[in-house]
């Protein structure tokens, strides 16, 4: 069975990497999980603390769009970590691919 996998890469403003990771680990990822979003992996890049990745998995691209639209429209997100996260991001890149479930599970940390 295939999963739709979204890979987000962020270039963060200089000096915000540790703060960003704390917000992700303590607030954003638990919020994602409460909304039923499968966060496969996330963290700072090994080469630069101000580079970050977030990998999320979904049943299909349609499911991804529905779930993320609902999540980003929620008061939990808008009144929660949204501003702290957006303020740290200088640029972002999004890639969406289909992977076998076993490959997705291999990315989990």
Regions found by a protein language model. Give the residues of each.
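Short, structured motif recognition centered on aromatic/hydrophobic residues
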Residues: 4-9, 20, 31-32, 51-56
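Short beta-strand segments and strand-loop junctions that repeat across beta-rich extracellular domains
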Residues: 10-11, 71
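Short, surface-exposed ligand-recognition loops at beta-strand->loop->(often short) alpha-helix junctions
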Residues: 11-23
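Long, low-complexity, Ser/Thr/Gly/Pro-rich intrinsically disordered segments that act as flexible linkers
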Residues: 12, 49, 87-109
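Residues that cap or initiate secondary-structure elements
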Residues: 14-16, 60-62, 100
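An amphipathic, aromatic/His-enriched active-site/gating alpha helix that lines ligand/cofactor pockets
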Residues: 22-40, 59-95
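Short beta-strand micro-motifs enriched in acidic
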Residues: 44-45
